[in-house]
Amino acid sequence: MAGVGRTMIAPLLVLNLIMYLIVIGFASWNLNHYINGETNHPGVAGNGATFYFLVFAILAGVVGAASKLAGVHHVRSWGAHSLAAGAASALIAWAITALAFGLACKEIHIGGYRGWRLRVLEAFVIILAFTQLLYVAMLHGGLFSGNHAAGAGGYGGDYPADHHHKPAAAARV
């Protein structure tokens, strides 16, 4: 993971952003019909875990899409100063997506009729749980790669306040 660069992270960032937007669309449609009491609608139905799954799926979609904005900023600036925000928000998005993943698995395990939109939403959440984990691993691999912009305050980089981390003899100017 030491050689992970923006050429590898950027396509995964775009893929995850598109998938999170699709999750927002399907989750909001299903949740709207579920709240309206249209559980006999061919696209909704579900079981006891459906409501909880829909709530966490829409939450994962919104937080995931928002974390991709921090990721876009990091890929554009490619500095250590933006890496922390991008990695932290991606980790939070993955945690919420993992919760939605667990509820999707529970909903599939319980069984019963589920409409095609609900099954598509389950599939997207399951796929996103793994692609987001890969994205988080790639970002955290960037913490140790040292291939960020020079002078951006990264680990081991020379920046104006770097004298605090050197022996006293070397800190004198």
Swiss-Prot record:
GO terms for cellular component: membrane. It is found in: Membrane. Keywords: Membrane, Stress response, Transmembrane, Transmembrane helix. It comes from the Eukaryota. It holds the Pfam family AWPM-19. InterPro entries: AWPM-19. The chain crosses the membrane at residues 9-29, 43-63, 83-103, 124-144. Induction: Induced by heat shock. Induced by drought, cold and salt stresses. Induced by abscisic acid (ABA). Disulfide bonds: none annotated. Expressed in roots, leaf blades, leaf sheaths, stems, spikelets and embryos. It is a multi-pass membrane protein. May be involved in abiotic stress response through abscisic acid-dependent signaling. This is Membrane protein PM19L.
